[in-house]
């Protein structure tokens, strides 16, 4: 499994199978009986919950040169899903899912980014940037998106996979706060009380 969450007494696991699997496994926590498997898209990677809904992101293919990067909304009641957009990174805060879709040109290590959010309570997709990116970040290779659960601050990591990366911090309203150096290829921020 690539990602796992708990929702309403069940574990939901996305199975990528090294790019060849397409299943969402559902396990009852009380019995831990054999998993129910639902076919979704190929090569899922992340799963999260917002507003009692499940959001799944992944590669959508095992063809490295042709990933469609779907982000889908999964309905646990009907066991169906619908695509809400493309995304490489997603995070949730206050029942809003924030998504970054990036296209990278590895010849010159530059990227272009599309940002949007999805309100799980109203089922509204907002197709505008949720942070005010500094100029350097607009073309950097983004490697992570995390949100501080206490105050809603966004943390976006960027790097080139060979030198130390940078973390860009934004207020909940998207205002840029600071940039600081971190290790190579930042993947997540962990928040400790």
Language model regions located:
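Predominantly soluble domains enriched in secretory-pathway, periplasmic, or organellar proteins
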Residues: 1-193
């Amino acid at each position: 499994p690539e990602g796992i969450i708990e929702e309403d007494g069940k574990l939901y696991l996305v199975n990528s199978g090294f790019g060849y699997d397409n299943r969402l496994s559902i396990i009852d926590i009380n019995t831990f009986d054999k998993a129910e498997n639902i076919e979704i898209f190929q090569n899922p990677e992340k799963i999260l919950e917002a507003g009692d809904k499940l959001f799944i992101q992944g590669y959508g293919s095992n063809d490295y040169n042709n990933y469609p990067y779907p982000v889908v909304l999964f309905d646990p009641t009907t066991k169906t899903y619908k695509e809400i957009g493309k995304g490489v990174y997603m995070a949730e805060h206050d029942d809003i899912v924030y998504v970054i879709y990036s296209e990278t040109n590895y010849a010159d290590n530059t990227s272009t980014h599309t940002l949007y959010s999805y309100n799980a309570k109203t089922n509204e997709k907002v197709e505008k940037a949720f942070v005010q990116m500094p100029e350097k970040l607009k073309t950097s290779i983004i490697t992570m998106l995390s949100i501080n659960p206490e105050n809603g601050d966004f943390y976006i990591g960027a790097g080139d996979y060979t030198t130390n990366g940078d973390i860009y911090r934004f207020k909940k309203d998207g205002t840029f706060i600071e940039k600081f150096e971190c290790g190579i290829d930042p993947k997540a921020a962990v928040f400790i009380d």
